[in-house]
Amino acid sequence: MSDRSLSELGEQGLLPLLQAFCPAEQRGDDAAILTPPAGQQLVVSSDVLVEGIHFSEATTPPAAIGWRAAAANLSDLAAMGATPAGITLALALPSDRRLSWLQQIYQGLDRCLKQYDCPLIGGDLSRSPTATLAVTALGWVNPNRVIRRSTAQVGDWIMATGTHGLSRLGLGHLLGEWTLAEPLRDQAIAAHQAPKPRLDVVPLLARSQPAGTVWRVAGMDSSDGLADAVLQICRASQVGAVIEALPLPATTSFDRDRLIQAALYGGEDFELVLCLSPDWAQALLELLGEQAQVIGQITEKPVVQLRLSDRTEILSLDRGFQHFTTH
């Protein structure tokens, strides 16, 4: 089929092409049917990606838009301790957008979903002057093993998986804000365009739980930055924190101050930030190895303080990205 515009194909011409990405048993009806595993509860997460706000041609090829749309929502499931059950994708697009662009969106989405064993189970199409993707992810969770933001306690260790700041470095390189050298450049661009939701950590939490203890894991993902994650957990749990280490990219070729700001406030790293009792945290570290580190501790005073060898500062939500603000 030639690379026609969406207006030339029309909705009825598009639907069979897009339904091919869904399992056969989920095609053709008005809604999807899911059967919950015994003893599991449903977890639902929604996300919207708007062209010019969340992605642009300069930084994100269509396949990467699809991958990121899936990854962001799968990361929310991981942050709740859930496993994926399915995803829906609704799109509103300009009528002159090309079919190849839309197909690449679905191909990127499909690659991500297959990697994490999650089916595409539905969606919708509409016309709009601005390209917009609305994703809903559904997952299953054992109600006795939910991760909450509100359960951190004084004395908990704060753990962060992976590296923070890479996505922001990649975005800055693509926007021309700075030039990264190899191998950091490829690592940073990959982190921005193809983030990896940490669903692998969810089963390890159960495996590392100390015998005879009650399930209590506080956490969330770091989609809006490491500082935001710690601050949101502390706000919900009515506690504070001291951060004494940061999981920065391993490089000596980039300014340290920028690395720190990227890790704290850059966002879109889609790692997990978890608060656990010290013995539980230590057991999880032994399973994750270099994929995680302890970055601080929960304190009673409701302030989040960064305390590194070369700086001390109070962290604030005002420094990170927020919709409807001008900074």
From Swiss-Prot:
An example of a GO molecular function for this protein is: ATP binding
Q: Which family does it belong to?
A: Belongs to the thiamine-monophosphate kinase family.
Could you say which EC number(s) this protein's record lists?
A: 2.7.4.16
Comment field (misc):
Reaction mechanism of ThiL seems to utilize a direct, inline transfer of the gamma-phosphate of ATP to TMP rather than a phosphorylated enzyme intermediate.
Q: Which residues bind Mg(2+) 5?
A: D224
Any idea which positions bind Mg(2+) 4? D30, S45, D76
Which intervals of the chain form a coiled coil?
Answer: none
Kindly list the positions annotated as binding ATP: Y106, G123, D124, R149, S223
Return one Gene Ontology term, BP aspect: thiamine diphosphate biosynthetic process
Q: Which SUPFAM superfamilies match?
A: PurM C-terminal domain-like (SSF56042), PurM N-terminal domain-like (SSF55326)
Gene label: thiL
Q: Which residues bind Mg(2+) 3?
A: D30, D76, D221
PANTHER family reported for this sequence: THIAMINE-MONOPHOSPHATE KINASE
Q: Which reaction does it catalyse?
A: thiamine phosphate + ATP = thiamine diphosphate + ADP
Q: What is this protein called?
A: Thiamine-monophosphate kinase
Q: In which pathway does it act?
A: Cofactor biosynthesis; thiamine diphosphate biosynthesis; thiamine diphosphate from thiamine phosphate: step 1/1
> What keywords are annotated for this sequence in UniProt?
ATP-binding, Kinase, Magnesium, Metal-binding, Nucleotide-binding, Thiamine biosynthesis, Transferase
Binding sites annotated in the UniProt record for Mg(2+) 1: S46, D47, D124
Annotated binding of substrate, by residue:
H54, E268, F321
Q: Which organism is it from?
A: Synechococcus elongatus (strain ATCC 33912 / PCC 7942 / FACHB-805) (Anacystis nidulans R2)
Q: Where Mg(2+) 2 is bound, by residue?
A: D47, D76
Give the enzyme class.
transferase
